[in-house]
């Protein structure tokens, strides 16, 4: 009689401990996620602040709009504030957005105790730079060291070099146009901004980038890093990890810039006082070297100086360069604006001939030029997205809502600059709105350089560059948008406003 074959054991019999462990882990995961959702919806300190359900539960809204849709998150805020009829909305589990000018001025004031959110400002692994310093006292000390370079008087001293670098670019553009080639001013004026900033950083170092038909490597790398920032919000250790795995690897443009910084820095790093005294105007790097010697009695590292320099370059490219492109585009789109601007420039006689010394007081008081620049800042918010701050222990009252301590709080320039009550028809470029003689709220809402203690240190330099460039350009040159012209100038939020398409022009000397 044959013995029957025993049945094969089931999977549960073969791997009982593993199956039970997986089941247990799944239950733990479900309970943890479910508990977090319940806590965020019904027991969180922000539960009474209105906003999308998905935003209260997770960071999905930010991920979807900023990464999947590529930098569109901050453009949803005005609609959300309207939908919920509230000056404050919840845009994340512990993140709120303000659209209230009084609250904005409380948060972004001189001496504010609403500190920068460290997880946001250090995600690009640049936590030693002046921009990313979150400690108020440490930032104040660093700013004092550099402030002499960024006063109005110091900015005016740089005018000859600003004009020299501008004329180099215009000569290149004239040559391009004579050859029948269109000029990509989106890349060219941003490249010019790099060379302007580099002059303040490194003094007489020559041009960091050259002008060509193709985008310079350094500009390509800056754009790549900016595009990566929304991703770094979710993976903040990505760059530090990559740097630790391949510390000597840098993109081509960044590597070349660091080499320029190294060549400039090494002869100065151990004897800063002597080198500064030999020049009428120190550079940012020289002042940082001197400060390190004075406070720490030792020189800074070359890597530290290169990182600080790169942060300045990164900050200056799209703020000044992008605003110039926006101004030129909108001026050329409206013959009436171009005519009125030229009439004012011609009447001022400030730009009669190249090389004429500029009366900066008179230049700063040209009403229509200033109106064009203000409107360019408004319609092209250089930093359109959230600039997160941490609510201090006393909290913040916004209308009928109380925002508790520890909440991450943001207020965006895009929302302020496109406020329909203050700026009717906000998508239209209307410089005349800045020529009003009555008291209005426009100046309070226009904050292209932010406000308070953490406002952009380079505001005087940037404004001088904008006035000089637009004044010189439209006094001496004829510009024409290439066909087909863009119907509008659109941007996406890569921390800075990044153009969706380039502006192309032809240029020639102005006919008498």
From Swiss-Prot:
Q: Which is a Pfam family this sequence falls into?
A: p450
**What is the enzyme's main class?**
oxidoreductase
Name the GO terms of the biological process aspect. Answer: biosynthetic process
Membrane-crossing residue ranges in chain numbering: 18-38
Quickly give the catalysed reaction: hancockiamide A + reduced [NADPH--hemoprotein reductase] + O2 = hancockiamide G + oxidized [NADPH--hemoprotein reductase] + 2 H2O + H(+); hancockiamide B + reduced [NADPH--hemoprotein reductase] + O2 = hancockiamide C + oxidized [NADPH--hemoprotein reductase] + 2 H2O + H(+); hancockiamide D + reduced [NADPH--hemoprotein reductase] + O2 = hancockiamide H + oxidized [NADPH--hemoprotein reductase] + 2 H2O + H(+)
Keywords of the record, alphabetical order, are: Glycoprotein, Heme, Iron, Membrane, Metal-binding, Monooxygenase, Oxidoreductase, Transmembrane, Transmembrane helix
For the keyword RNA-binding, the answer is no
Chain residues that bind heme: 456
Q: Where in the cell is it found?
A: Membrane
Identify the GO cellular component terms for this protein. membrane
Q: What does this protein do?
A: Cytochrome P450 monooxygenase; part of the gene cluster that mediates the biosynthesis of hancockiamides, an unusual new family of N-cinnamoylated piperazines. The NRPS hkm10 and the NmrA-like reductase hkm9 are proposed to convert two molecules of L-Phe to the intermediary piperazine called xenocockiamide A. Xenocockiamide A is then converted to hancockiamide D via a series of hydroxylations and O-methylations.
Official protein name in the record:
Cytochrome P450 monooxygenase hkm5
**Organism this protein belongs to:** Aspergillus hancockii
Q: Provide the taxonomic classification.
A: Eukaryota, Fungi, Dikarya, Ascomycota, Pezizomycotina
